[in-house]
């Protein structure tokens, strides 16, 4: 893989990780301070940003929608089992 492609991949992964952290913060703010309209708006914003990054990961051939759907099914089954 050449440096330019690797640099784009690195940037995509860095931004994805940053967005995941922002989603974590939005969730923990609700847990710490309670639910209100502003916090739900922030949560929706961060979920949307994360969804955008997932779509970009797919567009850059790092995974497929099918890969994600398979993993989603596995996670849902685990949650059913342990919830």
Locations of the language-model features?
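Flexible "arm" and connector segments at domain edges
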Residues: 1-47, 51-83
